[in-house]
Structure formats: C-alpha cells, structure tokens
Amino acid sequence: VELKRPYPRTVKLGDGTAVRLRLMEPGDVHRVLAFARSLPADDLQFLRVDITRMLVVMLWAQNIKAGHTVTVLAEQDREVVGYASVHHDQVSWQRHLGELRVQVAPAFRSKGLGTVLGREIFAIAPEMGIEKIVAHMTPDQEQAIALVKRSGFQQEAVLHDFVIDRSGRKNGRVVMTCDVAALAGSAS
C-alpha cells in the first residue's frame, strides 16, 4: 500500500518523550518479536494471535508485504515500544472494514502513545478504502475500552464465551466500531 502520510517521522508524547514512527517492513520480524516477548503475560492473554511466536510474526510481515495489513511502529533508540495495525480483507463482504490492533510497552503507557498510534491508523484507513474501524477486546480490558470510547468508538456487541485465553479460560469479546470519516480529519 502506497501511503501519502510521511514516514518515518518523530512525534512528541504528552510528557515530552520523543518517539519515531515508521511503517513496519518484512525485515522487522525480529524487532517486533523482541517487543512482543518483552510484554507482560497479562498483555498477551487475550491477543487474537500469539505474537510471541516467530511464525505468527512472519505471517504478519507477509500480510504487510501483500498489502492486507499496515502497521505503524513506534520506536525509541531503535527498539519497538508500541505499534498500531489495521488489517484489511479487500475481497470479503467486509471489505469496507479494518481491524485495529494496538499494543504499547508498559513504560510508554499513560503518555498518549496509544492515542497517537490510533490516530495514525485513522489517517491511513481512507487510503486503504476502509470506512469503519473495528476493535475487539475482552470485557475485563476496562482501560482499553475506555480509551477507544474516548476516541469515538461505540460498543456494538458483547459475545459471551467467545474467546479462550492462553490458559484455556473462556471470556467474552467486546466488539467496538468507529466510522473513519468521523475521525480521519482529526488525525491529520
């Protein structure tokens, strides 16, 4: 996907911390894997896929190369400290939807990095033909739900016993959506 938005570039977070934003490339597999493996177990508990596995990150990189996924990495000192991805199935009946995934290192939380990364995705989404962003969480991810609500998402559904965590425990899935047109202008 050729994007108009300029990358790489440096942004300042709310506390003045500078991070470099750039697009993930297939050669970033080991950096992303190192980031994923540094996350606390609770952060990994309900991810749709296990990003601590090499094969999973390699498939992610293949989706980037094929144009199905765009991932914005946040780096400091060449280490990944967060990312936001939008996954887009261009041929299904949901081709107007993009799935948002955001992950931020604990040391960079409460600084606005998740919000910055989310805004990047909303700025990119129209260039991909995406009209609506979908986010999936579990009901106990209260901070994440509050963050996406503040960003303009609304809850569409709660699907009970819909996901199984890494330890085999079932939980619900909260489905939240936001129209891209409503937020794309504020992401510029």
Predicted regions and their residues:
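Active-site acidic-Proline motif in GNAT/NAT acetyltransferases
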Residues: 102-107, 111, 139-140
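Conserved GNAT acetyl-CoA-binding A-motif
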Residues: 118, 125-137
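C-terminal "cap" of GNAT-fold acetyltransferases
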Residues: 161-188
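Conserved acetyl-CoA pyrophosphate-binding loop and the N-cap/start of the following alpha-helix
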Residues: 108, 112-120
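Acetyl-CoA-dependent GNAT
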Residues: 49-96, 101-105, 118, 179-181
